[in-house]
UniProtKB/Swiss-Prot annotation:
InterPro entries for the chain: Acyl_CoA_acyltransferase (IPR016181), Gcn5-rel_NAT (IPR045057), GNAT_YJDJ (IPR031165)
Top-level taxon of origin: Eukaryota
Name this polypeptide is given: Protein NATD1
Organism from which the protein derives: Xenopus tropicalis
Family according to the record: Belongs to the NATD1 family.
Pfam family, one: Acetyltransf_CG
Domain N-acetyltransferase: 18-108
Gene name linked to the record: natd1
Alphabetized PANTHER family for the sequence: PROTEIN NATD1 (PTHR31435:SF9)
Length: 109
């Protein structure tokens, strides 16, 4: 039976999120390089992004990977001084559970 890298990770292990600005996505490599968890976004204005979709392969769900993607995306919004529209239900949930002032002040309806 094959085991992935994450099978042996404990929850406190750091998950490396990569940001591909050209593709407008955040991703985490899973199981070597074949599987990826991704968070997609689009610019909908000069200083506004729409955080559209988060996807984690079924076999890797429930391990906190989406949370790392959401944090990276919201931190990007803060660092770049952008506004964010949250189309993705998971990011809406993440911000509700982590209502940091720097996140809340950048939300667009």
């Amino acid at each position: 039976m094959a085991h992935s890298v994450l099978d042996s990770m404990d929850p406190s292990s750091s998950i490396r999120v990569e940001h591909d600005r050209k593709r407008r996505q955040f991703s985490v490599r899973l199981n070597g390089c074949h599987d990826r968890a991704v968070l997609l976004y689009e610019y909908v204005g000069k200083k506004t992004v729409d955080l559209q979709h988060t996807e984690v392969p079924d076999a890797f769900r429930g391990r906190g990977i989406a949370k790392h993607l959401a944090k990276a995306a919201m931190d990007f919004v803060v660092e770049e001084d952008l506004k964010a529209h949250l189309t993705c239900w998971y990011i809406q949930k993440y911000v509700k559970e982590n209502p940091l002032p720097q996140y809340l002040e950048r939300l667009q309806p």
